From Swiss-Prot:
<dbReference type="GO" id="GO:0035739">
    <property type="term" value="P:CD4-positive, alpha-beta T cell proliferation"/>
</dbReference>
<feature type="region of interest" description="Helix alphaC">
    <location>
        <begin position="65"/>
        <end position="73"/>
    </location>
</feature>
<feature type="modified residue" description="Phosphoserine">
    <location>
        <position position="180"/>
    </location>
</feature>
<keyword id="KW-0963">Cytoplasm</keyword>
<dbReference type="GO" id="GO:0043123">
    <property type="term" value="P:positive regulation of canonical NF-kappaB signal transduction"/>
</dbReference>
<dbReference type="InterPro" id="IPR001245">
    <property type="entry name" value="Ser-Thr/Tyr_kinase_cat_dom"/>
</dbReference>
<dbReference type="InterPro" id="IPR000719">
    <property type="entry name" value="Prot_kinase_dom"/>
</dbReference>
<feature type="modified residue" description="Phosphotyrosine; by autocatalysis">
    <location>
        <position position="473"/>
    </location>
</feature>
<protein>
    <recommendedName>
        <fullName>Receptor-interacting serine/threonine-protein kinase 2</fullName>
        <ecNumber>2.7.11.1</ecNumber>
        <ecNumber>2.7.10.2</ecNumber>
    </recommendedName>
</protein>
<dbReference type="GO" id="GO:0034134">
    <property type="term" value="P:toll-like receptor 2 signaling pathway"/>
</dbReference>
<keyword id="KW-1017">Isopeptide bond</keyword>
<keyword id="KW-0418">Kinase</keyword>
<comment type="similarity">
    <text>Belongs to the protein kinase superfamily. TKL Ser/Thr protein kinase family.</text>
</comment>
<dbReference type="GO" id="GO:0005886">
    <property type="term" value="C:plasma membrane"/>
</dbReference>
<keyword id="KW-0472">Membrane</keyword>
<keyword id="KW-0067">ATP-binding</keyword>
<dbReference type="GO" id="GO:0050830">
    <property type="term" value="P:defense response to Gram-positive bacterium"/>
</dbReference>
């Protein structure tokens, strides 16, 4: 099958039809954004590959073949692919948008979803098994090999849609992927990977039993609402422990006695993650065991469970207070002779985790020099996030009950009147650092010479150090051309300060962009996140 034939079999979706792109997540097989299709008038999801260098025709065709496989795999519990965006500088799969995110978010956002009823948990497990069983029964069988809670999406009624199957070429070509510390060296995630796959030479023999091992770990995770091996930070420790036969604990501490059909479920889990692949059951056998369990629940209980989650989600959203056009008093840890002044700001300073407003607490001023300058700032750079991998400002600021909700569309706000302690005389801007000065002096040369690979490495480094906000990353990564991405990166550097600029300079040096010499002398950057951000221990 040639490239033209593949393109004709997949509905083409021009890039300019994808309006309002918004960053959602980043994974091994690319970056996922939401968008609004200009003609269809519906929201869609776009998984696009990070293209650092021009793809060879053979590479592009290999990737398109995988997209074609996804397009053919049409089933109730498989994420539907709507088309392909195949352009020189943008290659992406367009799918249905899943409003309730992933199973990982449902299980581990316990503030947002304090309780998940047992009937719904069992329905989710049953639908995952149905979806993977369908893939295994295709001709030829389609093996997922990256099954994890992050790839199990949930539609508006919390039904399962399995994503990211058959994307080995996408994962291979996405060279800029920012690997989790528990990511496997060849795609997939260590905690969901069977021990025989630690040794590549044995993969072909055991490949059919890979997905059932991952499913067993997911069953444990759904029933316990805990992260497998959450206390272990080194993937080598996990690999050694699993290769010695150790698995997540199934005692009452993790799987309490009130779990319906607990004995049967533990039996399924333990057989699914058996050390010997030949001892693991097929998905068909799992379904035969699960179907009688599902029949013990009345249909109404599933509906009640979904309504309960929707109510919890609404309540959590309503507790996120947006400070907008409302005069407020903030305690800013300032001397008594500098009383706090009033702030009017069109941004959200609270994450969902803060819950209902409580007593006023102190606010530590961010280290961003643009913030301290008193200059008007883009509100998007101040928003708090509640999603895996992002650090919010939980507990830093609380809002009086009188605070008003605001329109998220507000584009800018003035922080010049927050406090004379933060903004001396409201006009003096802190001196620009060496790295920032160098970037400003070399701006057009950087735009001309910075490669796509260097750009993506810079974004990865900024993400790993928590130096870039979600909205800023989104603005950069969704630009249609390399030059527009670089310009946006440099604009963001001007706002975010010296530490941000140092990362960009270091990556330019690492990539030997010799036309930009001489480089400024900046300290060698450590790989650890900055100390003023809390460490994220979740997987």
């Amino acid at each position: 099958m040639n490239g033209d034939a593949i393109c004709s079999a997949l509905p083409p979706i021009p890039y300019h039809k994808l309006a309002d792109l918004h960053y959602l997540s980043r994974g091994a097989s690319g970056t996922v954004s939401s968008a609004r299709h200009a003609d269809w008038r519906v929201r869609v999801a776009v998984k696009h590959l990070h293209i650092h260098t021009p793809l060879l025709d053979s590479e592009r065709n290999d990737i398109l073949r995988e997209a074609e496989i996804l397009h053919k795999a049409r089933f109730s519990y498989i994420l539907p692919i709507l088309g392909i965006c195949n352009e020189p500088e943008f290659l992406g799969i367009v799918t249905e948008y899943m409003p309730n995110g992933s199973l990982n978010e449902l299980l581990h956002r316990k503030t947002e979803y304090p309780d998940i009823a047992w009937p719904l948990r069992f329905r989710i497990l049953h639908e995952i098994a149905l979806g993977v069983n369908y893939l295994h029964n295709m001709n030829p069988p389609l093996l997922h090999h990256d099954l994890k809670t992050q790839n199990i999406l949930l539609d508006n009624e919390f039904h399962v849609k399995i994503a990211d199957f058959g994307l080995s070429k996408w994962r291979m070509m996405s060279l800029s992927q920012s690997r989790s510390y528990k990511s496997a060296p060849e795609g997939g995630t260590i905690i969901y990977m069977p021990p025989e796959n630690y040794e590549p030479g044995q993969k072909s023999r055991a490949s059919v039993k890979h997905d059932i091992y991952s499913y067993a770990v997911i069953m444990w995770e759904v029933l316990s609402r805990k992260q497998p091996f959450e206390e272990v930070t080194n993937p080598l420790q996990i690999m050694y422990s699993v290769s010695q036969g150790h698995r997540p604990d199934t005692s009452e501490e993790n799987l309490p006695f009130d779990i319906p059909h607990r004995g049967l479920m533990i039996s399924l889990i333990q057989s699914g993650w058996a050390q010997n692949p030949d001892e693991r059951p097929s998905f068909l056998k799992c379904l035969i065991e699960l179907e009688p369990v599902l029949r013990t629940f009345e249909d109404i209980t599933f509906l009640e469970a979904v309504i309960q989650l929707k109510k919890a989600k609404i309540q959590s959203s309503s507790s996120t207070i947006h400070l907008c056009d409302k005069k407020m008093d903030l305690s800013l840890n300032i001397p008594a002779n500098h009383p706090p002044q009033e702030e009017s700001c069109g941004s959200s300073l609270l994450s969902r985790n803060t819950g209902s407003p409580g007593p006023s607490r102190s606010l530590s001023a961010p280290q961003d020099k643009g913030f301290l300058s008193g200059a008007p700032q883009d509100c998007s750079s101040l928003k708090a996030h509640h999603c895996p991998g992002n650090h919010s400002w939980d507990g830093i600021v609380s809002v009086p009950p009188g605070a008003a909700f605001c329109d998220r569309r507000a584009s800018s706000c003035s922080l010049a009147v927050i406090s004379p302690f933060l903004v001396e005389k409201g006009s003096e801007r802190p001196p620009i650092g060496i790295a920032q000065q160098w970037i400003q002096s070399k701006r057009e040369a950087i735009v001309s010479q910075m490669t796509e690979a260097c750009l993506n490495q810079s974004l990865d480094a900024l993400l790993s150090r928590d130096l870039i906000m979600k909205e800023d990353y989104e603005l950069i990564s969704t630009k249609p051309t390399r030059t527009s991405k670089v310009r946006q990166l440099l604009d963001t550097s001007d706002i975010q300060g010296e530490e941000f600029a140092k990362v960009v300079v270091q990556k330019l040096k690492d990539n030997k962009q010799l036309g930009l010499q001489p480089y400024p002398e900046v300290p060698v950057l450590s790989k650890a996140p900055p100390s003023n951000f809390p460490q994220n221990k979740s997987l």
